[in-house]
Amino acid sequence: MSRFSSQVLVIAACVAGAVASACSSTPPAVPPTGEIAAPPAQPSENAAIEGVYREFWSVSWVSSAEPDQGWVQRLRAVATAELSEQVATRARQQRSQGVRLYGTVTPQITGTRIEGDRAVVTDCQDGSQAGLADAATGKPRNVGPSRNAVSATLSRQSGGWRVAKIEYPGGEC
C-alpha cells in the first residue's frame, strides 16, 4: 500500500481474493442440472455501477473548505452510510491537522464483476494530478501515483448501487 493511499482514505478491511478472482480468465461454472443461474449482467447494469464508482471519487475527493451537510448528502447518494461516515470523519481529521486534498483522481476502470447484490470494480486509478496539500497555503505536500491499484466493493441497496468499501491492494496495475 502506498503512503499516499493510506493517507487519503483509511477505509476498510480486506476482501480476500476479490481482486485475484476479478482478474481470473476462468469461465464461470455452469450450475448443475435443475439449478437456475443468475442472468449475466446487462451492459446497463455495468454502466450504472461504474457511474456510481466514478461519482464516488468526484464527490469524496473534497478539496474545498470544511465539508458541509450538502456534501455529506451527495456522498450518501453514492456510498453506504458506513463508508460515508468514514470518509467524512477522515476529511474532518485532515482539516484539523491542517491538511486538505487537492486536484482530482481519475478512475481507469479495468474490470467489473457482479455477484447478486454485490459488485467489485477494479481500477488502475491515476492520482498524478492529486494529493495532500497544506490547508492554509495550498502548497502540495505530496502527489499521488499515476497507476494506483484500487478495488471497490459496491452493494445494491434501495435506491441503487453504493460504494461500500475501498481497498488499495498494492502492486502494479
Predicted regions mapped to residue ranges:
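C-terminal motif of bacterial Sec signal peptides marking the signal peptidase cleavage site
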Residues: V19-A22
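Bacterial N-terminal signal peptides that target proteins for export
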Residues: M1-A12
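Extreme N-terminal export signal peptides that direct proteins to the secretory pathway
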Residues: G17, P31-E35
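Bacterial signal peptide processing site
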Residues: S24-P27
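Surface-exposed, charged secondary-structure patches
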Residues: S96-A136
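Core segments of small alpha/beta cavity-forming domains
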Residues: E35-R100
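Short beta-strand edge/turn micro-motifs at domain boundaries
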Residues: V120, P140-C173
